[in-house]
Design a protein with these regions (language model features):
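Core AdoMet radical
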Residues: 1-57, 67-70, 95-98
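Generic structural signal for well-ordered alpha-helices
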Residues: 19, 54-57, 86, 121-125, ...
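Active-site beta-loop-alpha junctions enriched in small/polar residues
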Residues: 10-14, 35-37, 70-76, 100-104, ...
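Alpha-helix N-cap and loop-to-helix initiation/capping positions
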Residues: 45-52, 77-84, 112-120
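Surface-exposed amphipathic alpha-helices with a cationic face
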Residues: 1, 23, 57-62, 125-130, ...
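Auxiliary Fe-S-binding modules of radical SAM enzymes
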Residues: 90-188
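Catalytic cores of alpha/beta
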Residues: 14-24, 75-90, 144-156
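Oxyanion-binding "anion nests"
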Residues: 68-71, 80-102
Length: 188
């Protein structure tokens, strides 16, 4: 009770019993990205189904956890797929939506995809905000594709971020992020 910290777990697809154990141990949020739209999902994942993701999110809510779920843009999907992903997250009443922008990495199946433009990322952020007006729209991987660490994205609709390095790419400097967000009038 000394610190006001929300514990968020990210353990993949789990059972209702596991969700209950996580909640009982102090976890208040569960992270389960849907990755993309239902239509595009088979193109990016073959180990489980889109419905597996949806059922996990519904079960997390059922046991009283809030949910963090978003996806990755720039994996060959259409803008319509992005709209469908945003609508699905709104339908599921997801409280926190991380938006990752793909940075094509040599040696991966996505290495030859075009890099997203800043304008494309900003339009996507604005659309997610419009469809999910009360959710945290959380900038995640790919902020380095935008000028000024993605500052414009915070005026386009993002109101949260993940800072520091990501799984496969370098991220933004924490101190620089804090200074930028404070200068923009956000509380940290």
């Amino acid at each position: 009770d000394k610190y006001d910290i929300c514990l968020c777990a990210s353990h993949g697809l789990v059972t209702e019993e596991t969700f209950k154990k996580l909640k009982d141990s102090g976890v208040s949020m569960y992270h389960e990205n849907i990755e993309t739209s239902r239509r595009n999902f088979p193109n990016v994942c073959t180990t489980h189904t889109f419905d597996d993701k949806i059922n996990g999110i519904k079960t997390a809510h059922k046991v009283g956890l809030t949910v963090c779920s978003g996806g990755i843009i720039g994996m060959g999907e259409t803008f319509e797929d992005r709209i469908d992903m945003a609508l699905t997250l709104a339908e599921l009443d997801v409280e926190s939506i991380p938006l990752n922008s793909l940075i094509p990495i040599k040696g991966t199946c996505y290495e030859d995809l075009p890099t997203l433009t800043e304008e494309e990322i900003l339009r996507t952020v604005a659309m997610f905000r419009f469809i999910n007006p009360t959710a945290y729209i959380r900038l995640a991987a790919g902020r380095t594709l935008m000028s000024n660490s993605g500052e414009k994205a915070f005026t386009s609709g993002a109101n949260a971020t993940i800072t520091g390095d990501m799984l496969t790419t370098s991220g933004n400097n924490i101190d620089e992020d804090k200074a930028m967000l404070t200068d923009m009038g956000f509380s940290i």
